């Protein structure tokens, strides 16, 4: 019977065949231990010299790392195993033998591993990170579908940009100038006026010459927009969504979190409501903590965000940033018009901002004024202005960066490990 490693637990005491790759092996003279993977999981195959033909035992000792195999044997319970079972191997068929596999069990440098990213993905830890990424995506669709959101796909090639100060990737669109999208937000606002509650999930591109552990050139964003939704309501949706994702990963990725040696105690504390601190109070807090490199009106850097998050040891909203350091489309704060109705959600443990969101300006004259203040061409945003001409309503939205969220939940140090094939400042291959 052919099966997968994940499904093999249904066949305790039965003989099955599994297609797999050999990740590692060891031998103690009369027994060979094969570490096998098939994409659904990892299992140990035990080859006892006394129970198989000499040819099979010799083959087990000689198989090379990452060779592909059909392995037949009896599934037996093993309480020492992470999955609770192993295979007593009876026969081995080599499909394709791998020669001189470059990523050996020894330690390798980061650049070497990134040069071989197409192979590094096969390792147990990288496999675990991608499974957690997949679960975050699955839980995202589950949350928004269950809460009445419609999935909308904004274009990747655009004529204008929502973040006026960010660097863009320029290309030619026949005889016109075009840019790779840095956010689908403006289009999602239009979609929200048709469907009420919408979300998108897709790639975004930012030509920022940054080499920090938090930045990728190409990354994926989840971007919901909600009509008839004010800032406070949006914060509630954000914390409900993040809590749902965290609980889903904890429930469905136990083996992956264990493979990564992730301490889940802090993730288990994540629940609504999240703490909130205004930008102004955050500046005061930082000064009290000895930071003398921040003044009101300046944006926070990674050390500042980490200090704030460490104080709460939970995801924390920093609200009401100064108008001058945020994009043009954010609704003024009626209690202080030098600030806007916005929030960044900062993940604990030093992972930084994972969500940026705001209530959007819904008044036409104010939006036109802001475009002028930010020295943006109003004609390029004519369709965006139309949304305020024809039935404008209070509306809010946010964007969650997938890779930073994966890094936080999986506990990896650098976001380069959270994308299958990351695009970094000096890396476009593989």
UniProtKB/Swiss-Prot annotation:
Keywords: Aminoacyl-tRNA synthetase, ATP-binding, Cytoplasm, Ligase, Nucleotide-binding, Protein biosynthesis
Superkingdom classification of source: Bacteria
Catalyzed reaction equations: tRNA(Asn) + L-asparagine + ATP = L-asparaginyl-tRNA(Asn) + AMP + diphosphate + H(+)
UniProt-listed PROSITE patterns: AA_TRNA_LIGASE_II
Localization in the cell: Cytoplasm
Single GO biological process annotation from the record: asparaginyl-tRNA aminoacylation
Gene Ontology CC entries for this record: cytoplasm
EC number(s) reported in the record: 6.1.1.22
Pfam families xref list: tRNA-synt_2, tRNA_anti-codon
Molecular function terms from GO: asparagine-tRNA ligase activity; ATP binding; catalytic activity, acting on a protein; nucleic acid binding; transferase activity
Self-association and partners: Homodimer.
Similarity comment text for this entry: Belongs to the class-II aminoacyl-tRNA synthetase family.
Protein name: Asparagine--tRNA ligase
Gene that this sequence comes from: asnS
């Amino acid at each position: 019977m052919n099966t997968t490693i994940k499904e093999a637990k249904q066949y305790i005491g039965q003989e099955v065949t599994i297609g797999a790759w050999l990740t590692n092996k060891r031998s103690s003279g009369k027994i060979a231990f094969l570490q096998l993977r098939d994409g659904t999981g990892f299992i140990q195959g035990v080859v006892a010299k006394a129970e198989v033909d000499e040819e099979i035992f010799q083959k087990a000792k000689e198989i090379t790392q990452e060779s592909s195999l059909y392995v037949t044997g009896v599934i037996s319970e093993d309480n020492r195993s992470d999955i609770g079972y192993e295979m007593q191997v009876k026969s081995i068929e080599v499909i394709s033998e791998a020669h001189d596999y470059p990523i050996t069990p020894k330690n390798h440098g980061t650049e070497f591993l990134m040069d071989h990213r197409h192979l590094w993905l096969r390792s147990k830890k990288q496999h675990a990170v991608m499974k957690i990424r997949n679960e975050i995506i699955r839980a995202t669709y589950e949350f928004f579908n269950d809460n009445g959101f419609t999935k909308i796909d904004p274009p990747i090639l655009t004529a204008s940009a929502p973040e006026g100060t960010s660097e863009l990737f320029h290309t030619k669109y026949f005889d016109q100038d075009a840019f790779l999208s840095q956010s689908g937000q403006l289009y999602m606002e239009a979609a929200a006026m048709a469907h009420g509650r919408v979300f998108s999930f897709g790639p975004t591109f930012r030509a920022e010459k940054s080499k920090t552990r938090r930045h990728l050139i190409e990354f994926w964003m989840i971007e919901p927009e909600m009509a008839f939704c004010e800032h406070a309501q949006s914060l509630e949706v954000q914390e409900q969504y993040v809590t749902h994702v965290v609980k889903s990963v904890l429930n469905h990725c136990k083996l992956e979190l264990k493979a990564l040696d992730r301490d889940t105690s802090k993730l288990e504390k994540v629940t609504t409501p999240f703490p909130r601190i205004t930008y102004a109070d955050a500046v005061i807090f930082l000064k009290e903590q000895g930071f003398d490199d921040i003044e009101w009106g300046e944006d926070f850097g990674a050390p500042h965000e980490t200090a704030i998050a460490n104080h709460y040891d939970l995801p924390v909203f920093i609200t009401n940033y100064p108008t001058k350091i945020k994009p043009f489309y954010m609704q003024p704060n009626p209690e202080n018009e030098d600030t806007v109705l916005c929030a960044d959600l900062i993940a604990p443990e030093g992972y930084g901002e994972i969500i940026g969101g705001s209530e959007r300006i819904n008044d036409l004259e104010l939006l036109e004024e802001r475009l002028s203040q930010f020295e943006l061409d109003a004609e390029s945003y004519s369709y965006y202005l139309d949304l305020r001409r024809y039935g404008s309503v209070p509306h809010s939205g946010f964007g969650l960066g997938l890779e930073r969220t994966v890094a936080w939940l999986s506990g990896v140090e650098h976001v380069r490990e959270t994308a299958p094939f990351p695009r970094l400042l000096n890396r476009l291959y593989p």
